[in-house]
Every structure is written in C-alpha cells, then in structure tokens.
Swiss-Prot record:
It comes from the Bacteria. Residues 34-47 are periplasmic. GO terms for molecular function: bacteriochlorophyll binding; electron transporter, transferring electrons within the cyclic electron transport pathway of photosynthesis activity; metal ion binding. Antenna complexes are light-harvesting systems, which transfer the excitation energy to the reaction centers. The chain crosses the membrane at residues 13-33. It is a single-pass type II membrane protein. It holds the Pfam family LHC. It comes from Halorhodospira halophila (strain DSM 244 / SL1). This is Light-harvesting protein B800/850/890 alpha-2 chain. InterPro entries: Antenna_a/b, Antenna_alpha, Antenna_alpha_CS, Light-harvesting_complex. A bacteriochlorophyll binds at residue 29. Belongs to the antenna complex alpha subunit family.
Length: 47
C-alpha cells in the first residue's frame, strides 16, 4: 500500500474522493426530485 501513496498524492486522492461522493449524492437527489413519486418538495406527503 505504501508504494501506491508514493505514486499518488494522498491529500489530492482524499479530496477527489470527497468531491466525487458529493457529486454523486447531488446527482441522486436531483434524479429523485425529477421523478413524480419521489419528489418530496411537491409530492403528496401522505403517499
């Protein structure tokens, strides 16, 4: 494992992993907001 960190900068890798997860979370939320049954902002709150 230490050889991998000699090639990759660990700070940049951690930042890119967090940015990637944030983009994925936003993408999932916007996909759910675009559907009619999973839109919690304009949908029916009781099902």
């Amino acid at each position: 494992m230490w050889r991998m960190w000699k090639i990759l900068d660990y700070r940049r890798t951690v930042v890119l992993a967090h940015v990637g997860m944030a983009v994925l979370a936003l993408l999932i939320h916007f996909i759910l907001l675009s559907t009619e049954s999973f839109n919690w902002l304009e949908g029916n709150p009781y099902g």
